[in-house]
Amino acid sequence: MARSPCCEKNGLKKGPWTSEEDQKLVDYIQKHGYGNWRTLPKNAGLQRCGKSCRLRWTNYLRPDIKRGRFSFEEEETIIQLHSFLGNKWSAIAARLPGRTDNEIKNFWNTHIRKKLLRMGIDPVTHSPRLDLLDISSILASSLYNSSSHHMNMSRLMMDTNRRHHQQHPLVNPEILKLATSLFSQNQNQNLVVDHDSRTQEKQTVYSQTGVNQYQTNQYFENTITQELQSSMPPFPNEARQFNNMDHHFNGFGEQNLVSTSTTSVQDCYNPSFNDYSSSNFVLDPSYSDQSFNFANSVLNTPSSSPSPTTLNSSYINSSSCSTEDEIESYCSNLMKFDIPDFLDVNGFII
């Protein structure tokens, strides 16, 4: 006896499911379970066939469905299971919790199959096929630029010859030679690029090291200069005190010298000064003393003052005998004097 169709064509709804239909199906399965999919639509009050209800529940409405992109581990599992099971998507979905058979089939046809073809692998037998290998995409792909994913062409040819013992080879040997040369050339270019990048990195490191060393030297020089300036004794203050004292003594000597020289020169050139004669002043032995006492010898009054007659005669004689040379010698002798020992300034010099 032949099996009757799952649903009658008259009065059944086809097309997308509405939210009301989804809610009715979920409520019925949560209360009674799905049971027999042939009788479920009639019991749940749905104008759908049993197959449509099963697919709607399995692929969209069941609570344990895993949404989102497939992970790398799930992709590897699908490839391995497909190499053993083939296109048995329900069996593959049973080993991937949370994934549906329809979702796995769509992911295989849209992503995994195309990826295997680009890698030169037959998606049916999972064996290498160089006639399916897209060399341009491999050379442009960053996956094969890394050293860990370079394809070994000689190993690939050995595996092909071992697995397929046929009279006619699968691939033309000229294509194999071309592929091998392209891979080797690409590898050499990668080595040159890596060498250039490493050289540039070393030059950058050397330049940065030189700049850092120069900045460090400048920092240490500034630090040493500041420490020396902070540790120096207050020499400027002592020098200022010494300059004040030196100025004081110089002012003292200049004042006495100016007053004395002025008085002496006036005494020399004044013909009518009292109590002193120019001859006595010039010939006074006290001027041989090289000290500051010459002012006292000039200003002190002699013990015995001569008479006016003697003064006049001595003044006339001195006037007749003195010349310009004597005046110059007198002035030069007047400027010659030594600083006494008690004014020794060596003690002030540090």
Curated annotation (Swiss-Prot):
Tissue: Expressed in rosette leaves, cauline leaves and flowers.
Residues of the DNA-binding region: 37-61, 89-112
Inducing or repressing factors: Induced by light. Induced by wounding, salt stress and abscisic acid. Induced by the lepidopteran herbivore Pieris rapae (white cabbage butterfly) feeding.
A Pfam family it matches: Myb_DNA-binding
Keywords: DNA-binding, Nucleus, Plant defense, Repeat, Stress response, Transcription, Transcription regulation
Record-annotated HTH myb-type domain positions: 9-65, 66-116
Traits of the deletion mutant: No visible phenotype under normal growth conditions, but mutant plant show increased susceptibility to the herbivore Pieris rapae (white cabbage butterfly) feeding.
Record function comment: Probable transcription factor that may function in osmotic stress and wounding signaling pathways. Contributes to basal resistance against the herbivore Pieris rapae (white cabbage butterfly) feeding.
Protein's name according to its UniProt entry: Transcription factor MYB102
